[in-house]
Amino acid sequence: MTIREMRTLEKKEKLGSTYTDYYLVGVMEGAVEAHNQAVRSGAKPSICLNGRKLEPHMAKSLYTTELKRNADVYEADFPVQLVLTNALTTVYPC
């Protein structure tokens, strides 16, 4: 899903905000699992929790903070997964 598609869903659907919140949680969990699998396969880690919490309710704030922090970088057609993965590597660096 792109940033534009997510914004449209959030505004047009009755439960759009709820749908996007759940979507972001899934993207966040998927990004962490994909990262962990890559590390197990020998890739250099880029997301390190180091004992800090990463909970489902944090997905939305990670996403929106990353969009605000780099507003000039992300275009509407960029995937939400990219934004959230970049947020995770920024907030949980190694």
Spans of model-derived segments:
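Short, compact, well-ordered microdomains
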Residues: 64-94
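Short N-proximal segments of mature Sec-exported proteins
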Residues: 1-65, 87
